[in-house]
Amino acid sequence: MELKKYQLQVIKDLDRFLELLIEKQNISKAYNALWNEKGINVGIDGMPPYNPELAGVPQVCFKVPTGGGKTFLAANSLKPIFASMPHIHPKAVVWLVPSDAILSQTYKTLTDKNHDYRKKIDVDFGNKVEIYSKQQLLNGQNFNPTSVSDNLSIFVLSYDSFRTSKKDGRKAYQENGSLLPFVRFKQDSGTL
């Protein structure tokens, strides 16, 4: 499966944003510079200003119509994102979807080693990829500091995974002995 022309342009824009981010060492300045290079103002008469919802975490949004290949774009975005980051960090992705219906479909797709999306990710990361559901994470199933250090770890979650109005959603906030090895991992390596 190959990227379409407009998808290739999206990935090129992502690459350029990441270059500008490294150059400017400031997310908002990189965002403004990218749009300025395209001749588009940022502010009242152009693109909205960068919204730093998570301080220090670059937020990238691809606006693509239904059927436009958002999941394939996301799969193709992982390599450029991690290539631009220092190699000392574990490679971890929260693949957040809007609903539980899309969650099961996305999880099935990403765990199917014969699916084009998974094939792309496997090629880009040398087949060192682990896909986790919320339940696997909470149970510590194949999820440990060594796995996180050695592989690209993709956590497929939905917004519902964190909703506290549902009993299942509250489990993400409970203390969990299955995740205890990460405390020492964090203290030893300072990487999380």
Predicted regions and their residues:
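RecA-like P-loop NTPase motor core of helicase/translocase proteins
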Residues: 1-192
